[in-house]
């Protein structure tokens, strides 16, 4: 499958054919490898050895495996290491890791020498199905997440589902938030498949894992191709649940609450917000909530990071979200499972507060 300027490959083992795949995109064999500490430990030696066997010249950069690595100071340090290693425009950058590495590496590639090619090698479910696809790369600012960045399409997105077998269950459930999102916003049949084969997917059983990853990547790429720079509102539908999620993440200080966990909570809020004005039927609301009830969170997380929050403070935190215009929040809502739309009219603060209340009540009664 292809997006405007990238190619997505789902294959195991994908790294052993990276030289051949680079050639299809006209990429040279001088590559900066960006890892986080975890991916360097788990996969670094195998990736480097495989690439060197295929004739690559590589240098490696390693950052801490945390959201705070997406910062100006970290980027500045990496620029310096690349300059000292004589990296010029003939090089490319491969991001091996999750969303933090992909965002940070994409940001650096977009800005270094006014732009060098970037390749994404995602190693988490969330990155494989969402953040590595579509070319939106950014770092954080103390006043908000992903506020400073670029559109910089990866030349290649190399997806190997086998990498997921090293992940703890918390990371799998976090990634499933984005997988489920695609069923909600674009594909009722995919939603039904996830409902039927949920246990197999979260246990990483084939062929269901690869089906879920491939379908998610296809939906994301298809939306990006139709609305690369978010001019029609279609690409914004990928942010279902994210307006609430970004507010939650900001209130957590971008620590101790994973992005996927925030998105899952946010989708519950968004389902209630879709239902309250009458857009989403009761039956679809119940089906959606039934699937989201199968998520698992660390003990006490929902209470600490959502149920105990002040609702008004959460709404104010949401106002820093990128999906607002002139302090008017825009929400991605559903009118049925499998179809989303962008809505920025007639949604009052009272509506939002009530949706948060409904979600809090649901989480409490569901025993999270």
From Swiss-Prot:
Give the UniProt keywords, A-Z: Amino-acid biosynthesis, Aromatic amino acid biosynthesis, Cobalt, Cytoplasm, Lyase, Metal-binding, NAD, Nucleotide-binding, Zinc
What this protein needs as a cofactor is: NAD(+); Co(2+); Zn(2+)
Q: What class of enzyme is it?
A: lyase
Q: How is its cofactor bound, per UniProt?
A: Binds 1 divalent metal cation per subunit. Can use either Co(2+) or Zn(2+).
Catalyses which reaction(s): 7-phospho-2-dehydro-3-deoxy-D-arabino-heptonate = 3-dehydroquinate + phosphate
The pathway it acts in is: Metabolic intermediate biosynthesis; chorismate biosynthesis; chorismate from D-erythrose 4-phosphate and phosphoenolpyruvate: step 2/7
Q: Which GO terms describe its molecular function?
A: 3-dehydroquinate synthase activity; metal ion binding; nucleotide binding
* Pfam families assigned: DHQ_synthase (PF01761), DHQS_C (PF24621)
Give residues annotated as binding NAD(+): 99-103, 123-124, 136, 145
Q: Which domain of life is it from?
A: Bacteria
Q: EC number(s)? A: 4.2.3.4
| CDD domains assigned | DHQS
Q: Which GO terms describe its biological process?
A: amino acid biosynthetic process; aromatic amino acid family biosynthetic process; chorismate biosynthetic process
> Can you tell me which residues bind Zn(2+)?
178, 242, 259
Subcellular compartments: Cytoplasm
Its GO CC terms are: cytoplasm
Q: Which family does it belong to?
A: Belongs to the sugar phosphate cyclases superfamily. Dehydroquinate synthase family.
Matching NCBIfam families, A to Z? aroB
Q: What does this protein do?
A: Catalyzes the conversion of 3-deoxy-D-arabino-heptulosonate 7-phosphate (DAHP) to dehydroquinate (DHQ).
What name does UniProt use for this protein?
A: 3-dehydroquinate synthase
Q: Which organism is it from?
A: Chlorobaculum tepidum (strain ATCC 49652 / DSM 12025 / NBRC 103806 / TLS) (Chlorobium tepidum)
* Protein encoded by which gene: aroB
């Amino acid at each position: 499958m292809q997006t405007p300027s990238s190619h997505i490959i789902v294959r195991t083992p994908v790294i052993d054919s990276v030289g051949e795949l680079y050639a299809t995109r006209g990429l040279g064999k001088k590559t900066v490898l960006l890892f986080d500490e975890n991916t360097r430990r788990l996969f670094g030696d195998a990736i480097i050895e495989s690439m060197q066997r295929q004739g690559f010249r590589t240098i490696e950069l390693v950052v801490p495996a945390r959201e705070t690595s997406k910062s100006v100071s970290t980027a500045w340090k990496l620029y310096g290491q690349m300059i000292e290693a004589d990296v010029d425009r003939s090089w490319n950058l491969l991001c091996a890791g999750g969303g933090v590495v992909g965002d940070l590496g994409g940001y650096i590639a977009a800005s270094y020498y006014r732009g060098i090619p970037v390749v994404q090698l995602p190693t988490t479910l969330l990155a494989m199905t969402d953040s590595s696809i579509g070319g939106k790369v950014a770092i954080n600012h103390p006043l908000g997440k992903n506020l400073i960045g670029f559109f910089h399409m990866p030349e290649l997105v190399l997806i190997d589902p086998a990498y997921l077998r090293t992940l703890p269950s918390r990371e799998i459930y976090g990634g499933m938030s984005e997988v489920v999102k695609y069923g909600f916003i674009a594909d009722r049949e995919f939603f039904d498949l996830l409902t039927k084969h949920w246990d197999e997917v979260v246990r990483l059983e084939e062929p269901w894992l690869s089906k879920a990853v491939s379908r998610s990547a296809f939906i994301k790429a298809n939306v990006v191709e139709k609305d690369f720079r978010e001019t029609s509102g279609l690409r914004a539908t990928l942010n279902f649940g994210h307006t609430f999620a970004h507010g939650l993440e900001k209130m957590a200080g971008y620590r101790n609450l994973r992005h996927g966990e925030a998105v899952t909570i946010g989708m519950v809020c968004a389902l209630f917000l879709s239902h309250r004005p009458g857009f989403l039927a009761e039956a679809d609301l119940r089906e959606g909530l039934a699937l989201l009830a199968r998520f698992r969170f660390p003990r006490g997380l929902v209470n600490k990071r959502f149920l105990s929050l002040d609702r008004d403070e959460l709404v104010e935190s949401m106002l820093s979200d990128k999906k607002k215009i002139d302090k008017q929040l825009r929400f991605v809502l559903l009118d049925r499972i499998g179809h989303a739309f962008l809505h920025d009219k007639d949604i009052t603060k009272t509506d939002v507060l009530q949706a948060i209340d409904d979600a809090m009540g649901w989480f409490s009664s569901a025993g999270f």
